Amino acid sequence: MSDTKKSFKNVLEFVHKFRRKNKIKREISDIEKKIRDNQKRILLLDNLIQYITLDMNYEEIKKIIFMMKSDYEDRIDDYIVKNAELSKEKRNLSKELKFIIK
């Protein structure tokens, strides 16, 4: 393969990895926002539990709230895992980009 073709291939690879890195950066930001939103929902549900009175069919309402809280906690866990995976891929792409530049 000629040097020109190698260089062109390297440029294409660099552009592809750089775009992927930026996309991952945006996804990480989006996931962090989702984590914050769900943490706020958990706090809201915790506060709501404190205000429920016995004359409101307490056990049923409390059961529903606990189920909702559990769902939000599961979502946060999923987002944290996905965020970690994306961060790892982003780090690897950064290393590869540095290697291509040199």
Curated annotation (Swiss-Prot):
Gene Ontology cellular-component terms listed: cytosol
Keywords noted in UniProt: Coiled coil, Cytoplasm
Top-level taxon in the UniProt lineage: Bacteria
Keyword Coiled coil: yes
One family name in Pfam for this protein: DUF496
Recorded coiled-coil stretches: 69-96
Compartment list: Cytoplasm
Family: Belongs to the pole-localizer TmaR family.
Job of this protein: Pole-localizer protein involved in the regulation of several cellular processes.
Full protein name: Pole-localizer protein TmaR
UniProt organism field: Buchnera aphidicola subsp. Acyrthosiphon pisum (strain APS) (Acyrthosiphon pisum symbiotic bacterium)
Lineage, top ranks: Bacteria, Pseudomonadati, Pseudomonadota, Gammaproteobacteria, Enterobacterales
Gene name linked to the record: tmaR
